[in-house]
Amino acid sequence: MNIDFESRNITRRSFLKGAGVVGAAGLLSACGGSKSNNSGSTAASGAQAPNSTGATPLKEYISWESANREIESWNLLYSQTLSDANVVTNLWDGLMSFDCYGKLVPAIATSWEANEDSTVWTFHLRDDVDWVDCNGEVKEHITATDFLVGLEWVLNASKNEANNTSMPTLYIVGAEEYYEKTKDMGAAAADLRYQDMLDAGVGIEAPDDYTLVFTCKHSCPYFDTVVSYTSFYPASQALIDELGIETFRGCDNTNMWYCGPYIVEEYIQGNTKSYIPNPHYYNAANVSRFERLTVTMISDQAIAFQLYQNRELDEMDLNESTITTITSDPNNEYNSQLCEKRARPTAYAMHFNYQKNNADGTPDVNWNKAIANTAFRQCFYRGLNLKAWFSRYNKINPLKCENDYYTMKGLCYNTQGAEYTTLVAKEMGFDAEKYDGETMIRLRANGGDISALKKQAMEELSAIGVTFPVKATYFIIASSTSALDNATILKQCFTDSFGDDFIKLDVQTYVSSLTQEVRTPQLQSFVINGWSADFGDPVNFLGQETLHDDNAFYSHYYSNIARVAEAPADYQKDLMDAFEQYTDLVNTANAIVNDTDARYEAFAKAEAYLLENVLVSPTYYDIAWSLTHANEYSKINAMYGGCNYKAVNWETSEEAYTTVQYEQFAKAFDAAIQG
């Protein structure tokens, strides 16, 4: 179907419906009929949207999603993908939500507290929350029982098919045993109800209709962040009984029940989703919502740019070529409207392999000896200038991508409001350093001069038989020209920073699976990988690098330090001592369960030790540029959970935001999170 991007004789919404912007009309699923015409400002009435610029806010908003990220499951209890959660977060609320700084705020829970050792958590619920159907008609009142039903569904292997069990089985008393029981029962487990779960000793109870109590296996001072995960969302037994287990598991927008800020007005698979306000939303008086929110599936950014220019999109992310098109023309109207977004909630780092093999399966002793040396590793953190490489991710402000920490910024705050990584910066001695657009923060102390460290490393390593240059093997997928371009620039960064007489990047390729072709046979010198949090505590990051823990992901699957620990070579003694000391620091911090500030201070010391010894070397944040009519800094910005696409309290403007305005938003945001 042809798309006439010049037409102005149709509405924005009718254009999107008729255009089929991803090339196929898809399957139409609608609910509510003409009733949507009555939603308007009445259903959306409540708190005024934030307005820091005096602009005229938008009543309707058109956002976008990549065509390869279409929703697959509308059931949050069953789904395990963010692409699903990004949709359903607007339709289905849980105990907790987040604000624009990523801090926990009440949702269905109004308040919560823990006992002294943080093993028992009590949540007090609102008494005014209803389930509604796709027409916005009230079906049932939500009580604490709905959360019992939801957890039983998740833990019942016959019902939820083992999805989303990891969080409750890891933390809740009896949850793992109940899951195993249902797995052993097979199909018969489908007949179990929440009372069977309680009788089996699972650590959840509802002493009254609006109180929910969880009992944890061990002290868990961050459990309020754990229950933000979708495993702990409510479900209605009445709806499950009405639909049956199979249909409830595979429910869609037409037969599910809603308790979130919106209901689905219309869904055209592969094309658009439109939401209108839930007329019985419990928090309507306290949050602003759009009269209509439309999400358009986009298969090509060139199409997205045309749609944005024609005001058929209100926001879009920009790739490098589009930015180049705009910035290469000084008269381009969008030059003043380029808006830099906040970092995506993932911290990327260079994960060294301490037990590397050659292609024939024999140990790569040269690399293994080199990477076990502290001075050698410190050259990466203190001397590798990645500014040119960052430009691949942020063409305009490459150093905004600099990541100096292992834990993602914004993960958690102490009781004084200070963001956790500011505590790490203080431990590292660069808390007074600020972004200047010129020099990486961690290179400023010595100007990136690692000549003394390099000399020390080469002398110490030559004495144990290491030959130079040390080859650092880095794998990229063979089919990606972009990955090759990135790797070529990274290789030049190695040359410029280390000198080819010291460390030389060797770029290799894999066909399809990094895990099977590279990580499992242990062929890499390092992998650059990102970690996104599961919950809001530093141990979720720092615990991935410890020894003596089967759940330490990177220790087992990337660095292989857990394998080294089984039989370390003589040259790995100092390395193992460093990991043991780091592990002790993490465990000491994790044992502090009744003093949040002391806990975070202790974790900051552990993280600083990790960084000073460069057991892993942080690399970058992913920061995109956009054209937009929404203030990104007004949106939910959680580092964990699935709430970031919840469209409440967005500040918007009829006029596109400018670069200057976004710089002001960023400055205010940074000041706020630094306490």
What are these regions (language model features)?
Residues 67, 265-279, 294-361, 387, ...:
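Extracellular/periplasmic solute-recognition and catalytic clefts
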Residues 379-426, 478, 482-492, 518-675:
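Detector for C-terminal structural segments
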Residues 186-201, 207-210, 215-294, 302, ...:
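Gly/Pro-rich hinge or "lid" segments in bacterial periplasmic/extracellular proteins
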Residues 63-117, 257:
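N-terminal lobe/hinge region of extracytoplasmic solute-binding protein
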Residues 139, 143-149, 209-215, 261, ...:
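Alpha-helical secondary-structure segments
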Residues 110-175, 213, 304-307, 366-372, ...:
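Aromatic- and charge-enriched surface segment that lines or borders ligand/interaction sites
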Residues 1-10, 14, 18-28:
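N-terminal secretory signal peptides
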Residues 269, 307, 397-398, 434-533, ...:
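Ligand/substrate-recognition segments at binding pockets and active sites
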